[in-house]
Amino acid sequence: MTWAQTIVDALKEHEISLIAYVPDSSIHQVTKIVDKDEYFHLVSATREEEALGIAAGAYATGRNAAVFMQSSGFGNSINAVAGLAIPSRIPIPIFINLRGEHGEFNIAQVTMGRSTRPILDVLGIPHYTLDSEERLEEKVNGALKLCYASREPLALCMTPLLHGGKNV
C-alpha cells in the first residue's frame, strides 16, 4: 500500500468525507485517490484560507473535513486558523506538504518551509511529521483521533522523504 492510500484509508476510518485542498503535485497523490472514491467530496480551493473556511462550514453541518495545502500556503491561512478554527474549537486535520526541506530546488520555499512548525508551536497547534511509511498508519490514525477528541485543529506535516518531493 502506498503512503497516499494509507492516508486515504485513515480519513475514511475517521469518517472524514470532505477534502478541501489547494492543488499541488505532491498532494495530488492523495487527491487522485480521493477523487475516484464516491465516499469523498473533493473541493478544490483557490486559497488555503478558503479551504479552511470550507472545512469549518462542513463541521458546522455535522460533516468531518480535512484540508491539504503546501507550507507556503499555510502562511496565507494563519488568520483563518487563529481567528476561526482555534477559538471556535473546530477540529480540522491540516495536511501540510512541507517545502523548503530535503532536496528543495526553489529558494523561495525555504523560509516558510522552515517556519511552519515553529508557527504551529506558537499557535499551540499539535503537529506531527510524516517523513516515512514506517508507522505511518499509526501516526495518522493517532493524530486524527486526537484532533477530534480535543476539538482543535491539528497539523500533519508531510516531508519530501515521505512523498518524494518536487523536481521542478
Segments predicted by a language model, with ranges:
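Thiamine diphosphate
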Residues: 1-168
